[in-house]
């Protein structure tokens, strides 16, 4: 079985369990230090979206980050390779502003220049990096914006942790190998001409220990101070990227 089908089956199973239990995850459930990059991701989206925008979310999962998009009043097309995950989204959000569509991000079933904005929250590793970049650029309108939050694969501590998840059967090998790195961000810069990035969480691996010792608020401040004191890039856990199509 291909890695793509392994991941599809995994997420279909998780989505079915969520539907059966009526228990849906949200980015808002993250601890404060880990939620910081998602807050920034949402703030960048808020700067470029309005109720007339047509937004494509790739790798939407069970809608962990879709609620914020819908709250802006924009029309949202949530896509994922897992049909059961999209079923969760449809159950969670009953609005005519939402469209769901089963789609492979390597070959999006949309015409060129269809969307004002494309967003991705943690999904860029679920397709061939070059093919996904090509498809994102293709479906964006001129002056359209791509905004993403994802993990960065340059820190050896985080790379080791992802490999442990693979050994435990929680991730496929191709997914961890395609986790974005600085070289991939350079490809986005070459394609779009210019990108804006911000990096977070050089000490996120210490978060559980810090929270036990200091609590969430102080731990968040410590993490922020470390990120600001040092020019974190290679050591980052997460990044937020914004690129505009010329």
Which residues fall in each region the model found?
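Conserved class I S-adenosyl-L-methionine
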Residues: 1-50, 147-170
């Amino acid at each position: 079985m291909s890695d793509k089908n392994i991941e599809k089956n995994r997420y279909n199973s998780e989505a079915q369990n969520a539907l059966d239990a009526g228990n849906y995850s949200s980015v808002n459930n993250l601890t404060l230090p880990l939620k910081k990059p998602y807050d920034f991701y949402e703030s960048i989206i808020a700067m470029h979206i309005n109720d007339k925008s047509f937004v494509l979310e790739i790798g939407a999962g069970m809608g962990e980050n879709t609620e914020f998009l819908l709250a802006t009043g924009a029309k949202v097309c949530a896509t994922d390779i897992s049909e059961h995950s999209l079923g969760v989204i449809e159950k969670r959000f009953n609005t005519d502003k939402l469209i769901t569509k089963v789609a492979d991000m390597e070959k999006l079933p949309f015409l060129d220049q269809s969307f004002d904005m494309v967003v991705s929250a943690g999904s860029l590793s679920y397709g061939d990096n070059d093919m996904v970049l090509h498809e994102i650029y293709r479906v964006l309108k001129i002056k359209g914006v791509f905004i993403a939050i994802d993990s960065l694969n340059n820190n050896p501590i985080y790379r080791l942790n992802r490999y442990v998840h693979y050994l435990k059967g929680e991730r496929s090998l191709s997914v961890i190998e395609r986790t974005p790195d600085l070289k991939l961000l350079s490809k986005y810069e070459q394609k779009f001409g210019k990108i804006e990035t911000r990096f977070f969480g050089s000490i996120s691996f210490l978060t559980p220990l810090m929270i036990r010792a200091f609590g969430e608020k102080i731990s968040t401040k410590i993490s922020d101070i470390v990120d600001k004191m040092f020019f974190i890039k290679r050591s980052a856990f997460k990044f937020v990227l914004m690129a505009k199509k010329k």
